[in-house]
Amino acid sequence: MTLLTPQFPPLMKGLAAGPANPFTIACTEAGRGTDAGLLPWSLTDERLRAALVLAPEMPLHGAMAAFCACGVGLQNALGALSPPETAVHLEWTGGIRLNGGHCGGLHVAASTHDPAAMPDWIVIGLELTLALPDAGELEPGQTPEWTALAQEGCGEIDPVALLEAWARHSLVWLHELDSDTGRASLYREWRGLVWKLGEQIIVPLPDERPQGTFLGVDEDFGMVLKPETGDTRLIPLTTLLEEV
């Protein structure tokens, strides 16, 4: 793959990660005090990976909305570049669905796991499968749960252009969160994209896999889950924070 250098908005600084994990690099650099806007990235024929360092100015429970903002940013980017019939959905836990199949996911880490604390930094990571390995040897329907852009009619999308578009659209939504109506605007956009809303689901959390009906979210995008038996529970978005 011949790569052009991505061009990012002025508030973002790209960093080519080569074969290294951009999410790990972003978290390491954030811990060292790098400025917000650092965007390490890595591209191969089969995978796009990137991560964005943020410096929120609110407690962690509210700042986690950035995770959803970057998810909506990805859908907006794919929507602008992919064929019109392409369906993009976002799992609450970060998974990305393309025409119903898994094709990647979002990750999130922060300097603290205390919902009430003011985090020094938050990192949002993105992984997207561009092409399945040995896809030419796969029969149609052989991997129904897993897919890639190339398998869904999006193989002509320039991955560098997609990375640039994700950065631009995510920045729009991150800025929107700073406005008085930004959280409501993000919720309206996100609600139309979230996977299995109102349906029975299994939630793959780090320490458990609760089941129930996905009723909706609270003001901080925490999941409201109604089990078949017992009380309705709230699963905070901070539950998705990863150790790095």
For each of these PLM feature ranges, what is it?
Residues 48, 96, 222-223:
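Hydrophobic residues embedded in beta-strands of well-ordered beta-sheets
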Residues 46, 90-92, 208:
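Short, basic and Ser/Thr-rich N-terminal targeting/leader segments
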Residues 2-36, 56-65, 69-83, 102-244:
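Long, positively charged amphipathic alpha-helical accessory segments at protein N-termini or as interdomain linkers
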Residues 40-41, 88, 214-216:
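Short, exposed beta-strand/loop patches in secreted or surface proteins that constitute
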Residues 88-100:
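Catalytic palm active-site di-aspartate
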